[in-house]
Amino acid sequence: GEVVVGKHRVNALYGTGLDVALRANDIRDLVILGYATSGVVLSTVRYGADLDYNLYVVEDCCSDSDAEVHDFLINRILPRQADIVTSEDVIKALEAL
């Protein structure tokens, strides 16, 4: 069985039970992508860093209504707490498992 959680806040980890499910399965690495970079992606990365996860933001799988904000976050803010990767990087890593 897959774990299915409902998201009620911008942050995908807060109040969803996802953190508990991940820890129960000894999962410490999170690959984060989505819309909007300035919303769910940023909020989830910040909270995930506080929870000591290893974070990977998939740059080419994130977007924002403001391209300048997206670029600023990807290049200046998110790298402080996450590794910025491409979808190609993720595919290669998964194939190597």
Functional labels for PLM-detected ranges:
Residues G1-L97:
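Active-site-adjacent betaalpha module
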